[in-house]
Amino acid sequence: MGDVEKGKKILIMKCSQCHTVEKGGKHKTGPNHHGLFGRKTGQAPGYSYTAANKNKGITWGEDTLMEYLENPKKYIPGTKMIFVGIKKKEERADLIAYLKKATNE
């Protein structure tokens, strides 16, 4: 897949202002992502999602994250996530590799 260390840097630069990944991490503007892989959209306990996120009905995995992270508002119209996305496929792969590791520790 991608490079975990590069993915960690991407998360710190582009995601950590709004998200945490560690077990027991607090929700910020966006939800904590611990346990993300295999979870359906809009299901992180204790986070208030839009109906669009709750109703999307997909399960997060490498393929769904690859598409979502390219353009979140296109993938889930009505999401409150303001991030424009990551256009470079390699950067998305690196981030997903890190998320897969960090959200399961």
Swiss-Prot record:
Modified residues (N6-acetyllysine): K73, K100
Residue positions binding heme c: C15, C18, H19, M81
Its biological purpose: Electron carrier protein. The oxidized form of the cytochrome c heme group can accept an electron from the heme group of the cytochrome c1 subunit of cytochrome reductase. Cytochrome c then transfers this electron to the cytochrome oxidase complex, the final protein carrier in the mitochondrial electron-transport chain.
Entry's localization field: Mitochondrion intermembrane space
GO molecular function: electron transfer activity; heme binding; metal ion binding
GN (gene name): CYCS
Family as reported in the entry's similarity comment: Belongs to the cytochrome c family.
Metal-binding in keyword set: yes
GO cellular component, one term: cytosol
Name the record gives this protein: Cytochrome c
Record PTM text: Binds 1 heme c group covalently per subunit.
Annotated InterPro entries: Cyt_c-like_dom, Cyt_c-like_dom_sf, Cyt_c_1A/1B
Region described as Disordered: 22-45
Species of origin: Trachypithecus cristatus
One GO term of the biological process aspect: apoptotic process
Short name of one Pfam family: Cytochrom_C
Superkingdom of origin: Eukaryota
Residues modified as N6-succinyllysine: K56, K73
Keyword match Electron transport: yes
Entry-annotated residues carrying Phosphotyrosine: Y49, Y98
